[in-house]
Every structure is written in C-alpha cells, then in structure tokens.
Amino acid sequence: METKKNNSEYIPEFDKSFRHPRYWGAWLGVAAMAGIALTPPKFRDPILARLGRFAGRLGKSSRRRALINLSLCFPERSEAEREAIVDEMFATAPQAMAMMAELAIRGPEKIQPRVGWQGLEIIEEMRRNNEKVIFLVPHGWAVDIPAMLMASQGQKMAAMFHNQGNPVFDYVWNTVRRRFGGRLHARNDGIKPFIQSVRQGYWGYYLPDQDHGPEHSEFVDFFATYKATLPAIGRLMKVCRARVVPLFPIYDGKTHRLTIQVRPPMDDLLEADDHTIERRMNEEVEIFVGPRPEQYTWILKLLKTRKPGEIQPYKRKDLYPIK
C-alpha cells in the first residue's frame, strides 16, 4: 500500500492484509535476512556466497538471461569464464543485500569502516558549491547503499523505482530505502515528480539500464553488442540544471568491503546530441562494469529490443536452452 503526497512521493505503508497466512513465507524471509544482517560479515559472506551460487543453479530462467547477456556483450570470453561470472554474480547479490539490511538495522556508523569512496572529493565539492546533482548509477547489486549513506549524512536524495511483485517485499524493501530519509518516486508516476525533487535541491539517483523499447530509444553500442538506449540523462541535466556524476558500488565478499567509485561529472553532455549522450551513458556503464562484471544485474532483459528483423535473444531457442 502507499500514500502519495502532491509531489507524488511514494511512502510505503503497512497494510493489514500483510498479516494473512499467504505472506508468512515472505515475512520468514525478511526475518531470516535481518538475522543474517546481524551476523558478522566474515561469517555470513562465505555462507551467502555458497547459497547464492546454489540458488543461481536452480534459477534457470535468470541464469539463462545472464548467460545470454554475457555471450552478446563478451563474446571474446570463454564459456567457462562467462559461467564463472554468473556464479560470482549470484554470490555477490545476497552479500550486497545483507550489507544493505545491516545498514538499515545497525546504522551507518557500523558499516562505515568497511566502506571506501574513490572520488569522494567530487561529491564534497558539489556539496560545498550547493550544486544540483544527478548520479548516473549502473544497476549493480549494492546500488541502494550509496544513496542510503548519503541520506544518513543529511543529503536529500530522490530516486525512481519499480514496485516489487510481492507486496510484503515491496513494503520492506522501500521502507529500508527510506530508512534515513529522501524521496522515492514510482516509475508509474512518470518523470515529472523526480524532476521536481531535483529542482528542489534533492540529489537525483538515476539508473540508465532499463530497456524502454524502440519508440524513444536509439540503438547504440553497448560492450560488443548494441542496446536500445534513451538519452534521458542529457535532457534531465538541462531541465533540472544539474550536473551528472557517474557512480558505482562494488561489494567484495572476500574483504567484506564496499567500494563506491565516483567519476568526474559528465559536463561534456551539455552541448551533445542525443546519439552522443546515449553512447556516453553506455560508455560509463562499460567503464564501471567491465573490470567487475559480477557486480552487475545481468539477469535483467537488458537487450530485449532489437533491430527490425532480429529475434529477441531471450526468445531464441538456440541460446542456452533450459534443460
């Protein structure tokens, strides 16, 4: 359930129906994650890695999507290398989620010693100059943690999101996201509420990975293939009068540390045409994800929209048929 203000801010609210027995399994899962989050990371991370890899073998559809994406983006890598990336991706996912839960339950002071920022001076300069900012954030598994940390330090944050299929998970997940303040805007409400928040001084959090279809997108190079890409970030920076700053979080399950990489503002986009903007967006994703592909959510249908006459890769029966 949700309550909406006049700025279309999404505020998750507990609904009485969440007590129904059909949701007990979801609540058990939430309780389990909370318990895991309170376990020291040196104990939980190896266990979560094994569980994640096991789940990745069972989740055949998700695994297939990831392998298809990797085969198109990294054709130069061997099949064994791509399988290893997928295994590490499934290992990283629960580890990053556990850190997010730990942050929400125990507070930022407990995880700060395990967080390192590369390029923090860029953010500090923006704050000193009171500049409007939109972070360009590839969809990694630890994607929510940097925004939560900045919100915990008093920085007003605004982000757009998709609702989860399970209403209990949706309620809990978005409550955790708002743990330290900030605004959430449902994508179903359109882009205007997000723009309004950035204009009001909230730092925006924008994920560029979604496939919006062929109507408003262009086909632009993405790793070794191409992707339907929307030049939205260029328009947003002009409409919001904001600077665009690429950011990407990397969780290392061996050191139990999160590294948040921040790159210089994309000021070159101000006078760029749509094609250049789209390519620069994808280029930033490549710079972040290329060295650490296991951090990225390859299970998404990133390459769904194809050029006329080309079959959607996820519908091709010759690509990684499920046995």
From Swiss-Prot:
Keywords, comma-separated and alphabetical:
Acyltransferase, Cell inner membrane, Cell membrane, Lipopolysaccharide biosynthesis, Membrane, Transferase, Transmembrane, Transmembrane helix
| Residue ranges of the TM segments | 23-43
Q: Quick check: keyword Methyltransferase in the entry?
A: no
**Phenotype upon gene inactivation:** A msbB1/msbB2 double mutant is impaired in its capacity to cause TNF-alpha production by human monocytes and to cause rupture and inflammatory destruction of the epithelial barrier in the rabbit ligated intestinal loop model of shigellosis. Mutants have no defect in their ability to enter into host epithelial cells.
The principal localisation class reads: membrane
Q: What is its EC number?
A: 2.3.1.243
Named in its record, the pathway it takes part in is: Glycolipid biosynthesis; KDO(2)-lipid A biosynthesis; KDO(2)-lipid A from CMP-3-deoxy-D-manno-octulosonate and lipid IV(A): step 4/4; Bacterial outer membrane biogenesis; lipopolysaccharide biosynthesis
UniProt key word Manganese = no
One of its GO biological process terms is:
lipopolysaccharide biosynthetic process
What protein family is recorded? Answer: Belongs to the LpxL/LpxM/LpxP family. LpxM subfamily.
The identity of this protein, by name, is Lipid A biosynthesis acyltransferase 1
Protein species of origin: Shigella flexneri
